[in-house]
């Protein structure tokens, strides 16, 4: 999975950056928001909790997904500006990220114990 930033602009009135991106996924279906959020946060060098993926759209037959994300200066700004349902969706994505990281840590510790 490869993420490319197409356009990025500052929106100082709303304390955020707005990013248009494309995800190329040759070997699999449409990626989950949690995977894309992790990649975007790494590319933009920001904390995962301030990256809100507004939308992701795939076209039939193409192996790419176009999306739009908002990167806030803080979680407080995100919660103040975004509608409540978007904040709830964002929190669910963050929970998915946490559970994925916990599962990968557990599997790594089990593998290291087996090697010993």
UniProtKB/Swiss-Prot annotation:
Gene3D superfamilies per UniProt: 3.30.70.3370
Protein's UniProt keywords contain Ribonucleoprotein: yes
Compositionally biased residues, Acidic residues: 96-116
Any Pfam family: Ribosomal_S24e
SUPFAM superfamilies recorded: Ribosomal proteins S24e, L23 and L15e
InterPro entries: eRP_eS24_sf, Ribosomal_eS24, Ribosomal_eS24_CS, Ribosomal_uL23/eL15/eS24_sf
GO terms classed as biological process: translation
GO cellular component, one term: ribonucleoprotein complex
Chain positions covered by the region annotation Disordered: 81-116
GO molecular function annotation: structural constituent of ribosome
PROSITE patterns: RIBOSOMAL_S24E (PS00529)
Keywords assigned by UniProt, alphabetized: Ribonucleoprotein, Ribosomal protein
Membership in a protein family: Belongs to the eukaryotic ribosomal protein eS24 family.
Protein's UniProt name: Small ribosomal subunit protein eS24
Organism: Methanopyrus kandleri (strain AV19 / DSM 6324 / JCM 9639 / NBRC 100938)
């Amino acid at each position: 999975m490869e993420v490319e930033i197409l356009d990025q602009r500052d929106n100082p009135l709303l304390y955020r950056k707005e990013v248009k991106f494309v995800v190329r996924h040759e070997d699999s279906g449409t990626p989950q928001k949690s995977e894309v959020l992790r990649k975007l946060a790494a590319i933009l060098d920001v904390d995962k909790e301030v990256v809100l993926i507004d939308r992701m759209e795939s076209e039939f037959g193409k192996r790419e997904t176009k999306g739009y994300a908002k990167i806030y200066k803080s979680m407080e700004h995100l919660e103040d500006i975004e509608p409540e349902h978007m904040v709830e969706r964002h929190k669910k994505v963050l929970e998915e990220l946490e559970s994925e990281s916990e599962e990968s840590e557990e599997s790594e510790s089990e593998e290291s114990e087996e090697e010993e």
